[in-house]
Amino acid sequence: MALASKVATRPAVASRRGAVVVRASGESRRAVLGGLLASAVAAVAPKAALALTPVDLFDDRSVRDRGFDLIYEARDLDLPQNVREGFTQARASLDETKKRVKESEARIDADLDVFIQKSYWTEAREQLRRQVGTLRFDLNTLASTKEKEAKKAALGLRKEFIQAVEDLDFALREKDQASAAKKLEITKAKLDSVLAAVL
């Protein structure tokens, strides 16, 4: 018997299922309404997100020349250690070093006396420590440019200046106004003698 005759003679099987009724549930309605609400919010949201003022763009490529990337240089392991710590850059220009020293001297002369008279002990200590932090390094740099005997004398004067600064710092920590004023004058005199030797 051929395949066509087998298919044609097969008896038809009646479906055992009855009629299927589809009902919409409340959850599917909520999902549809939620989707509509979300699309409406998405359509309105970009208008609300617009800035009231325009965005200003600045070309700050020149700040790299002024030292903006120093923190990244400090982390760059491909650079030598003295470059990463900034020692090479600070010693590169003696004119900049002299300018920093004169600025520190001016701040010590002008600010510390006012802070001591007003009993601003914390400000006086912080200003002193800020200025001496750079002066230690810069005085060494300036002394290293001198001849052997002049360098030795300058480093000796620097050591006396640092001791006077430590005495002044102790007087500031003790909050002794008379002692601090006296030691400030000694510190200024020692700084002037060091600067006369290195500048």
From Swiss-Prot:
Recorded superkingdom: Eukaryota
Organelle targeting sequence: 1-51
InterPro entries for the chain: PsbQ-like_dom_sf (IPR023222), PSII_PsbQ (IPR008797), PSII_PsbQ_pln (IPR054099)
An annotated GO BP: photosynthesis
Coiled coil: none
GO cellular component terms given for this protein: chloroplast thylakoid membrane; extrinsic component of membrane; photosystem II oxygen evolving complex
Keyword ATP-binding among record annotations: no
Record carries keyword Membrane: yes
Sample GO molecular function, one term: calcium ion binding
Subcellular localization(s) per the UniProt record: Plastid, Chloroplast thylakoid membrane
Major location category of this protein: plastid
Keywords: Chloroplast, Membrane, Photosynthesis, Photosystem II, Plastid, Thylakoid, Transit peptide
Matches recorded under Pfam families: PsbQ
Disulfide cross-links: none
Family assignment from sequence similarity: Belongs to the PsbQ family.
Protein name (database record): Oxygen-evolving enhancer protein 3, chloroplastic
Gene: PSBQ
